[in-house]
Amino acid sequence: MLTAARLGAAALSAALLTGLAAGPALADSPAPTPAAVPDGLYGKSDPTYDGVWRQSLALTALTAAKVTPADSAVGWLTGQQCEDGGWPSYRAAGAACDPKTEDSNATAVAVQALVALGGHQEAVDKGVGWLKANQNADGSWAYNPGSPGDADSTGLAVNALFAAKTDPAGVAKAGRSAFDGLALFQLGCAAPADQRGAFAYQTDPAGGALTPNALASAQAALAASGGHLPVAGTVHADAAPKALACADAPAAQGSSASSAPVSHAESGEAVGAYLAAQLAAGGDHLTLTTPGAAPTPDYTATAWAALALSQSGHPQQAAGAVDWLGKEGATWSKGGTDAGATATLLLVAQAAHRDTAALTGQLTALGPAPKATDASATATATAPAKKKDGGIGQYWLIGVGLLIGVGGGLLLSLQRKRNTHL
């Protein structure tokens, strides 16, 4: 799933996150030979860049929908893990692991999927171990180890730690925790008021101001709110997300207080307030802006914003985005044939406690037949809804019609006889 939004910052990191066509940044690179879709994998498109990503999202979403995936689907994901614990985006059957192809995004979502499935503790522990080993010295994570960290990858890694019940505050390099790494990318009180709480994709090596990024903000927000996939969405707050509290007097500008990192305690609410404002201003969706191209709806960022707001207990602020995705999401999912997009839409619907039957049915159809399915999860997706009378409603109506007809005939006959005797 390639996008120009992230290719400019870290070649393939965005490829797993947006579901859009490849951007011009790869125009000079020879196109790889499309990989054959292996048995057990959800979706029919080339898995080279998103195989582990879409499989992990599909397994997570279906498990939350009480669908027990086929052994081949689970086995494909576990078989992609390398001996050191990391996952690549995709590894052809029989191919050796290459540490240079392992990435934090694939590893993070695979860990969350296996936690959701249950029964894969050894693989989860190895995945968490890989994340710990490949954390940057500033506490962040890069898409590929050895590169500068970014907010999306750091947020996904923190999601995986939460899923594995590993406190991110205790996962550190050189004294910098995962929360410290996440804070590197969040705009604080030194930023303009309408940008506070947002996340930048990466920091400026020259020390310049952080630039808000829609996808980075949306994905980092789930981590800042203490969440992971799947989002339960059971906590409800009465108030809107609390914006970052800043002293805006002129004397405070440029002070150490205004330039201080956003604390972890305030981080989730601050980015939630930013996302809620952006959604309200953008017609209930976030926007992808790429240099040289017209702005377009950012389906991925909108979905992750809805997940984050649901996680932080603000379903009212997420509702508009959930509704928008319900109306427009088929464009993103290509009518339910894109496994990664369909799985993400299902995760959003689950977090918002919306009807999930159709999406569950679509996603189930994109992979191997499941071992077991909760009938209530897919009933409306596979057959017309039955009446509350247990399915005999049409026969009851026919019977009533016949009785009325017979009764009417008798009355007419009696009336004729009565007229004859008068």
Label the predicted regions.
Residues 2-422:
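Preference for long, amphipathic alpha-helical scaffolds in soluble/luminal domains
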